From Swiss-Prot:
<dbReference type="InterPro" id="IPR027417">
    <property type="entry name" value="P-loop_NTPase"/>
</dbReference>
<feature type="repeat" description="TPR 2">
    <location>
        <begin position="1150"/>
        <end position="1183"/>
    </location>
</feature>
<feature type="region of interest" description="Disordered">
    <location>
        <begin position="326"/>
        <end position="359"/>
    </location>
</feature>
<feature type="compositionally biased region" description="Acidic residues">
    <location>
        <begin position="333"/>
        <end position="352"/>
    </location>
</feature>
<dbReference type="Pfam" id="PF13191">
    <property type="entry name" value="AAA_16"/>
</dbReference>
<dbReference type="InterPro" id="IPR019734">
    <property type="entry name" value="TPR_rpt"/>
</dbReference>
<feature type="repeat" description="TPR 1">
    <location>
        <begin position="1110"/>
        <end position="1143"/>
    </location>
</feature>
<feature type="coiled-coil region">
    <location>
        <begin position="1516"/>
        <end position="1547"/>
    </location>
</feature>
<feature type="region of interest" description="Disordered">
    <location>
        <begin position="1544"/>
        <end position="1571"/>
    </location>
</feature>
<feature type="repeat" description="TPR 3">
    <location>
        <begin position="1192"/>
        <end position="1225"/>
    </location>
</feature>
<keyword id="KW-0677">Repeat</keyword>
<feature type="region of interest" description="Disordered">
    <location>
        <begin position="1500"/>
        <end position="1528"/>
    </location>
</feature>
<feature type="repeat" description="TPR 5">
    <location>
        <begin position="1278"/>
        <end position="1311"/>
    </location>
</feature>
<protein>
    <recommendedName>
        <fullName>TPR repeat-containing protein DDB_G0287407</fullName>
    </recommendedName>
</protein>
<dbReference type="InterPro" id="IPR041664">
    <property type="entry name" value="AAA_16"/>
</dbReference>
<feature type="repeat" description="TPR 4">
    <location>
        <begin position="1234"/>
        <end position="1269"/>
    </location>
</feature>
<feature type="compositionally biased region" description="Low complexity">
    <location>
        <begin position="1544"/>
        <end position="1563"/>
    </location>
</feature>
Amino acid sequence: MKNIFKDKNIYILSVENDQRDKCKSYLISKKALVEKRFSKKVNIIITSEKTILENKFPVNTATKLGIEIIDYETLSRDIERFIRKTQPTSSNGSTSTTTTTTTTTQKGQIVSFKPTSSTSTTTNVINTTTTSTTSTTTIVDPIISLIVPPSGSNNGSFQIAIFGIGFLAGAGFRIKIGNDNGGGGVFASNYEFHSSTSVLCTIPNLNIKCGQQPIYASNDGGKTFGFPIQFLFFDTSIHRIPTAREQDGMVLKSQLDNLKRAISNIQTMESILMRRISLLNGNHDDSKSIEQIFIQQQNFIESGASQLLLGNGGTTDQLLQSLEGSEYSSTNDDGENDQSDDDDDNEDDDDFVEKNSNQVKEEFSEREIKIFISSPFKDMQLDRDQIVKVVIPRIRKLCIERDIVLSYVDLRWGVTSNQSEQSTGLSMCLKELEKCNILIGLFGERYGWSSQEKQDPKSQQLLQSTLDRAIQDFPWVKNYRDSSITEIEFRMLLNQRQQQRNGFFYFRDPYYLEEVSQMDKNNFVSEGQRSKEKLEKLKQEIIKSPFKSSEYRRPTNLSDVLYEDLEKYIDKKYPSGNCELKGFEKERFLHSVFIKNLTKIYITNENYFMEIDTYLSGSATSSGSGNKSISIGSSINSGLLSSLKNKPVFLIQGESGSGKSSLISNWLKQHKEQHPEDLVVSHWIGASPSSNKFTSILIRIMNEIKNQIEIDQKIANGGSNSSSSSSSSMFSTTSTSSVSWLPEIPDETFESEKIVSEFPQFLQYVMSHPSLNGKRLVLLIDGLDKLDPRENSQELIWFPRNFPHNVKVIVSSIQGSRQSEVLKKRGSHILSILPFTEAERKSMVRLYLQKYAKKLSDQQEIAIAISKSTTNPRFLQLLLDDILVFGDYERLNDRIKTLLRAKNTSELYEIILDRIEKDYDPKAKGLVSEFLKYIWAGRRGVEMSMLSTLLLKKNIDPAEWGSLLVLMEAYITSSSGVISFLNDDISKAVEKKYITTPKIGIEIHTNLAEAFEQSGDLNERKVEEYPYQLLKSENWESLKNTLTNLYVFDKLYTPNHKVDLINYWNVLEKQTKPPKNAAERDDPIPYNCSNEFKAIISRSFIQASGLVISDVWFRVASFLEELSQFDGAEVLYNKCRELYINNSQNIEAAKVDRAMGRMYLTMGQNDKSDSKFRLALSIYTKERGQEDIEVAITLNLLGTLATNRCKFDEAKQILNQAMNICESKYESNVLLIADIAYSLGSVCFVEPNRKLEVAEAYFARSLELTESKVGDMDVAYARILTRLGSLNIEKDTYADAEAFFKAALKIYEARLGIDHSRVSQILRHMISLYEVQENYKMAEQCCIRALAITKKIYGNSHNLVSATQIRQALLYNSMNRKQDCLNLLNEVKVTREKEFGPDHKQVKHIIDLIKEIDKPIVPKAPPPPPPSSSSPSASSLLMKSITSLPIVNGQAVLSVPKPPVSRGPNGIPIPPPPPPTIKLYTNMVSLQSVMKQNVGRIPVAQPTSFNSPVQPPSPRTQQAIQQGQQQRQQVQQQQQQVQQQMSQKVSSLQQQPQQQQQQQPSQGYGNRQNTPLFQQPIFQQQFQQNRIQQPQQQPQQQAYVGDMLAQFDQQKLKRVQNANDRSGASQIVENLIGKKKCSKPVSLVNKGYMEESNQIDMGALFD
């Protein structure tokens, strides 16, 4: 085409933005002038075909003026060619092969039919008919569209299948790999053609460069090539070749894609031919039309499009109408024909963004009411206050009920002095009014600011400049230069009436002036006679207008009148019962409103956005999903990208109020604009009443995915109206059931476990469906920390650990929350939100206030921005919100200073509450304080009905606090009728401000408790709140009665409330009962859970209608067992077993037997436990068979019992049998499999030939399974951690052992309370750990605390208490606190004498132990040397006295004068004689020697001689002795001095054997090589025979299961290396046996609890 555009003025109309930009560039290159608006000077209009057909302005005007009109599609090919020349070639080429262009000329017009690609199904139709020419151009260069497989080895020598368009089978066909069109590269070989669209070829055996390489196709021997497609060559050593199955799948998928393209091409050609027929028919005047000839010849087009000719008589016009409504009609539509003289590019851009940004916003945009309040300022302050503080809250409540969004604009101080100086005030007001759909106008006696008012020249000049500025934006204002600003605002509604806008005008009674003080009256009277006349004229015009107008007496009356009018307006537009949304639609509406509020103002942080985008593109294409990816080298840091790979979840965390939700919502808005092809589903916890339940989250996500897929299908099918016309084609790929393949979605009635299990299956099925090929799903869940804590949701068991490759998940939570900890342990990528910078704060202030048409001065903005408190976004927003409702601009500076005095958000809330009290409780009736105190006192909030009753007792009218409720919607939230605070900061502020004494808090809790007591039904709310309120009100007797109520217990003893029930009893048992007599007053009786329930069961008749009493007693007994109150549990177990047997319920009786066996196992009563287990096993086997799940559970317990009884082979056999049953039939019972794995690991850990690595593997597997099912804060999880701690002690990895123990201790304390038997069990293990490390201080603290807990549970005389006391005494002995040790042992002796008698062996054992510790240690003298033939010389006496001294490191302790050195015959000094052999003692008893022995058995150490036979002196020694005799006189003078020094060292010598004992290498942690006083089997037998049972005490244990680790065979344990080994013996042992190595299973490496537990301050646990 020749250049017809040179020097022409061209106007582009109704063309999409991206095409508009390309067209502009093309026209500029043709030296054309592009006009922004249509005018007479325009020579050519370029527009869409649809706009031409509509023939509206400016097309119709251009036609009359003879201006050329060109269809944009006519130029599209030239424009695309121009763009390709000016921009780098894209890696993905075009997929079209043939372009047919039909050009029609009429009256200088140039019109073209749309060039259609292979993937297009649209057709342009016009009715212009004249001369036509048709030209067809064939593109000979073949185009590649797909390669299978998409990657291969860089070594080559493999085949690939290439699919595309225009392949010509012949010698000239080439496939080239690498380089560009200019030559070079590698050519493929062995071409095997299957069609013109597919070919099989071989990549040659060459070393090709790794990475993405282009592959081209050529039909002319390689001279010219079509557009390339990228192929990934990888290093064979890193990547693998796809399997044959994978390649076959890709080939089939590609064939299906080619079939779809073929159908699309046929449909395209079909539509072109049909249009040509219509044109031919229009160019002839024959009576017989073309379609009739066509029908007579019966040459039907096989695709079925010819049926369009037959519809409704088959006329051409009807044909065109059918085509316009069919799927071939143009989709290039702007939605409405709104082009005018004011149309420009910027407006088009805004329209485009608005229409494509947010579909939800468009869907619910009609459900929004925005009010603009207009009036003169000086005399209408009180009136406007009534609207803002009274009417708006009441109307907002009504809007909430009708699912309507309400907002308002009040510009009392929004026009700052700076804006006034710049004269932008009126323009800003009119712009805000333009966005509103309701105007509320107020008038008193003042007309308002106008030229009629007497004012100084400066004000007059300011008014004129303000009007001039407004005229620039709103030209119609020039007609009202003499009017007041208020009238001009009114005129915008009166003169430009629109259907969607409405107005309410109110005129105050002139007699109100009589109530105004004389001082203020000047602000209320008219400005002058002319102003009065203009005001009266305006009022008359308003009264005659269709808008509502009324009069009111005083400001207080205005609220009633205005509310009534607005209520009628809402009732008419949104009628009650018809407009409310329901179900899924209402959820979508509430979430859309929530998002809209978050996206109004946001200071974009590009770093945050980039990191989220990087996560999404991290591995988008690695799995072949077809998702778009971002170039690593261009815009993504490769290090960050590699760190994001394999990260299942992207976690955004930060402090409360740090802006996490705003970040997600605004990123979401941008992402939808940039990636409309993605499926994006967001869930905002807190947006709706049910949004915090994890089941609702999963169900809503599945529904949203289904809804979006349905919408996408409708859009792809050309809208809902295209179904009928599209069905005429036999090749149509659409159907009315296009989404029928979607699986059924569960609803709220399903069990939570089923919903959780079906959710990942739903995602996997949907995202792998062929119709979603290349789609990516982005899931966003905001506010995980706000989850309802019931059903253990905070452990995120419901949250999938793995997602499909094309699903990306982004979540947010408060930093440090339980949810964040869980996601960190799962390896999620973490983005931490930082505080606001000063620049961000300043921008936030300006933009936030600008949204409400207000602005602060520069000084005020700076004061807020530099404050340290405003670094928190929530703090800053609260401050700005308070400023917005502050109506007095004159005192605004003082208000800002007051707000900035707050150091944190909680203090800011206190200041805000002061303002709310002054505004809404001026008479100090306690409206605000009482309202907030009751919300504070509720555990999970307070019901509105109950709050109304409570406030009514305080003489507060419900209508008053109803408005307050709406007013404070920014601070409170409502969920299912329950009101609660939005965050903890508000609760802290209310507590600090109003709960000033404990008495006030108790009174509030008491009122709530009474309210719950009066409520009839025992619903979930009452079960959750009533005991809590009794606890907080310290009403102990009522709390006891409530907890022992069988109906309440049945509701509380559930997974959701069990922890609460345990905590209630833990607190209650620390209290005492009200005294009934003087004796109880002097000796108060504490509450005891076991005694209270035993008292109930002793009654003759128990009222429990509706409950199965035997089942209830079984549950009570299980609860008492959990509390370690075994005596009461045993009584109740026997009671419910009796009931089951009487009713012939054998299975239930077996359940009781097994539970009792488990309890006896815990108590260490192995014989009773074995009897109960075997009885239960026989019943289950008989009733249900040998492979029932109940049999497996019982076998697991029997295996544990066999392990405790050291029957390890039997234990393995039983446990393997249980495991086989589970793995064959009950794979889903993960917890049971984990428990059996734990039991097998315990056997491997404690058996004689221990296998620590095997045991650790079992424990690791059990830990992994348990965590997947119940999380890492469950008691079952803590039990495994305890065992791993003991195992690591044996492996000498004390740091890991301590971490495991601390993690288990944390769980037990959180779940079971700080005084539970499991806690004492952990503490006893930690005593052993710290004693081995000689950290006696920490060991003592653990021992003291464990002893206190054990005494509380078992009583002072229990055997386990005595054993713990003995461990503490020996610990004191190791700490050289001998007297404390003896005192404690004497206390144990007295206790055992009372229980067993003075002659019992345990008493004698304690006595022997006391004697051994109290006995002074005196070293024995070494044997004398052999007698000499001669008399002893002085030298021999000296040596004898020296050798009698203790030896340390081979030298005598005392220094004595050395005798003269004797020399031999050659002058060589004679060597001294060797020192005599020293006899060592081991009669010191230490904690290490007994800490792992059985309970109640303490070994007494016996002296062991390590001396060797004394050797006779050597000849040299004899010679030295002979020479020493010559010095006898000299030695005798020194002998007396040496003996005196020896006597002074006797006390120090007593300690040396103990030190030597500690320096010896020994075996097993805590075991010494000594001979115990009693052998274990004999001692246990005698102990059982002689033990005296006390009815008041609990049964004595044979071996406490919690101390099972202390029952190992000590002779077979190796001594661990002591951290503070001073003798060097450990080094010798290490050299002999080699250094130990610790190899943890992979699942235990880098566990989060290891680091967390190491940070626990153990000292803080004992404060």
